[in-house]
Amino acid sequence: MSSLRNLLCRLISPLCKHGSYSHLQLFLIGDVSKSENCVLSMFVTNKKFLSKDLTDNFYRKFLKVWLKCDLDSRNQIKAIFNKMMMTKNFFLLLAYLYFLYRQCKVLKILALYKIQRLTWKQIVERFKQYPIHKLNQLLEIPSFVSFNDLYYYLFQQQLMLPISTHCNIPCMKLFCLRNFEQCNDITLRYAHRASNLTYQDIFHGCSLTVPCGNFIFAMAMAMIENYCYSFDRFLIPLENNNLVPIVLNKQEKHQLPKILTFALTTVLKRSLTSSIISLPVLCFCKTKCLRYAKIDSYLTVICSKCGHCLNSGKERLKGKQTFSLSSMFYYRDRQEKNIIYSMHTDLLYCSLCGGQRLTLEKVYELYEYSVSGIQVKSVSWKAIIGTNSACTILNDSVKFDAIVACSCRTCYSMIHLQNLTINKLLKLISHSTEFQCQDCQNIYRETCLDLEDCGEICTGCKISQLAKCTQHGCDTW
């Protein structure tokens, strides 16, 4: 007799026609190239959860597989659930169990916070103990409420597809910590004389119950933050391989997070958040002429804490996944990100997270450096995306927008590219691609190589002249 797992794989797996790692992609970012190619897309928790068109389409495909299946397997699956005939609602239950089996496979390679890593055998045992009246209700009227109730019974968690990795895993819990969650405030008390009160004594008396905070902890936080942002490599000691407690719980008030928590948070913010992507230069023929260069051209302001670009203007860049950070300023949904200048403190702030650590980066840059006494010239191209989670676009099925430098050699302006994929973006700086702004399409400017009486050719034109471009591609020098 075949096991339930083998029967589900035999009946449901033919409905998943896609490439490798598509299920992993679905569980993490909720995106597949085409929803009709994966039966698990029916359970994505959005407005189209168990949509009629999608379920009808998969049910028709399933009936073809069901009729081709041998009689013994069909009788076994009906005997396990005590059903006389196959219906659409029965198919949805089988597809949901297959979804749980695939989640077990995903959890074998990922450790997700608060999600129990159950084996398939444990899930089957718990499923057998599920109240029969609730199972009949699910088969009678399948809905998100009924499937969510079954999921909560098995995992003690709400059903969520994709899995909310950006707010549930320990990294993101650390990532979103506020300063007041790091340690408790302390109260400063004074002992003063009862008579002969001076003006200073009056102020001391008014400040008896004013919380001043832990100034030693604040100084240690500043030192660690400066160190982590100044050096590329550092060691953080972990006591007994344990990062808990991450957030101060009401039940565990005696267990206060240590300075280690803040150090891990700082490292994660520096390592994970980014809206800048360095592009590989496949051909140097697009190296710009320095005769038209400007000092402040291609400068971008990046917040080191939240990773967003703050001077992208009013461009609305498409991007799905974003690290949601706690804001200390009022922030409307998806409004223009900018820099706030405080006239009281004479400091600059990020309008999104309130961070004061702002850095400048160039989207295009030609620079020189020395290696063992040899002068080396290098060209750097970068792209700005609309999300601070650049790692989520590393999938060819994810489409996004980006701001890059204009490909014209005499132009130092930017251009907004739409509906890009990671493969298209990585091949952008090549000989065969052109992405010019509107001004460059109407205005012709001469470079050093175009001038007949040019006395000295700039460095950019020299690099462009050395690039070996052919009809079929290009070679780097």
Curated annotation (Swiss-Prot):
Q: Name one GO cellular component term.
A: viral tegument
The protein's name: Protein U33
Question: What is the similarity comment for this entry?
Answer: Belongs to the herpesviridae UL49 family.
One of the GO BP terms on file: viral process
Query: Which species is the source of this protein?
Result: Human herpesvirus 7 (strain JI) (HHV-7)
Disulphide connectivity of cysteines? none
Q: Tell me which Pfam families the record gives.
A: Herpes_UL49_1
* Chain segments annotated as coiled-coil in the UniProt record: none
Identify the InterPro entries for this entry.
UL49 (IPR004339)
